[in-house]
Swiss-Prot record:
Name of the protein in question: Hematopoietically-expressed homeobox protein hhex
GO biological process, one term: cell differentiation
Any Gene Ontology CC annotation: nucleus
Biased composition (Acidic residues): 250-261
Length: 272
């Protein structure tokens, strides 16, 4: 629907409904211009503003009232190569020789482009801040693999604290950073203390088991020391007859062990 404006009729130009009136001093923000009182005073009946099919009618009516291009500071889509589109994208064009909206898409599509990333062009300035991807938080949670967790748990059972060289060695073995290993041990110690406070009886059992393990390890060390001393006594050529008698008594008849004994007549191979 088009109408002939008094000032534009003298020039013989046809202006569409949504085109601003090319006044000498345009005042689109005045109440008289918004309500169309100027057109009523000039004898032309004021036409009602058509409703636009948009989810936000107030916003679309505001767009129709201001009559300014939405993507004024942003690049225009290549499809908008029409001379009228270039005129609409300029800042404050003085003449309106061509329609402002020569496109097939309704104005509601442009209003939707303010909310979502539309193919018409870039959204307004606040939209990229809303739609920007969330970056990974520095120092975020690190997920360890099952093998890494098992090795870390084994190391924690034997040693609650790690020295810097041990931490470096363990991190290199598990292909982790020293900071990750240090953080894991700190969290594991905190969990261990919390469980210790919640269940003191279970901690006593753990302490007794650890003491038993220490005793077993010490016994094994003592036995290995005795065995080494016996082997050294067997290898000694100046062993006493009492040691040889003890050796004969220690070796049972069912044993297949072969022992070399040095006597007055040389070495004999005694198979029992």
């Amino acid at each position: 629907m088009q109408y002939q404006h008094p000032s534009s009729s003298a020039l013989g130009l046809s202006v569409p409904l949504f085109a601003p009136t090319p006044l000498q001093h345009p005042t689109p923000f005045y109440i008289d211009d918004i309500l169309g009182r100027n057109s009523a005073s000039n004898g032309t009946p004021a036409l009602p503003t058509p409703t636009l099919p948009s989810p936000n009618s107030s916003f679309t009516s505001l767009v129709a009232t201001y009559r300014t291009p939405i993507y004024e500071p942003t690049p225009i889509h290549p499809a908008f190569t029409h001379p009228g589109a270039a005129l609409a994208a300029s800042y404050g064009a003085s003449t309106y020789a061509s329609p402002l909206y020569p496109f097939s898409r309704p104005v509601s599509d442009y209003t939707h482009a303010l909310i979502r990333h539309d193919s018409l062009g870039k959204p307004l300035l606040w939209s990229p801040f809303i739609q920007r991807p969330l970056h990974k938080r520095k120092g975020g949670q690190v997920r360890f693999s099952n093998d890494q967790t098992i090795e870390l748990e084994k190391k924690f059972e034997t040693q609650k604290y790690l020295s810097p060289p041990e931490r470096k060695r363990l991190a290199k073995m598990l292909q982790l950073s020293e900071r990750q290993v240090k953080t894991w041990f700190q969290n594991r110690r905190a969990k261990w203390r919390r469980l210790k406070q919640e269940n003191p009886q279970g901690n006593k059992k753990d302490e007794t088991e650890s003491l038993e393990n220490i005793c077993e390890e010490s016994q094994e060390r003592c036995l290995s020391a005795e065995q080494k001393s016996r082997e050294s006594s067997l290898d000694d050529p100046t062993s006493s007859p009492t040691s040889q008698g003890n050796l004969d008594s220690e070796v049972s008849d069912d044993s297949d062990q072969e022992v070399d004994i040095e006597g007055d007549k040389g070495y004999y191979n005694c198979a029992h």
